């Protein structure tokens, strides 16, 4: 069976929208796999699209997957940023489970008292900073937080090298 037949059979079984979704997911999954391997040293995490109420992306602990809001599937940079952000949250939890540093204790406390609407939490600033650094260095893409105040905090976090320190 050739690629054209596979595509036709898939579309007949699941519909053209699902095929298009797979074509969008492939480069995202490849990017996530690369970052897991080269930057975080963790096993790859599956990426899927679903209907989400508001977030661009979230990490599903039960499924061990990154769920992307299908409303954003045409905005590659936005969903790639969401993937990287959620990957960093996954890595933060691994870090917390395996380390007893001041940073691990702060992050643990922030996860235990998580406030979805407080974007100034260190775990959020760290995830945003990680995403922006990887987008720039690995993919040559620029993404800035839509809130200028939060972006200043992210820039300060990156400049301070806290992203690299175990303080």
What would you call each of these model-derived segments?
Residues 20, 24, 28, 80, ...:
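Hydrophobic (often cysteine-bearing) scaffold residues that line and stabilize catalytic clefts
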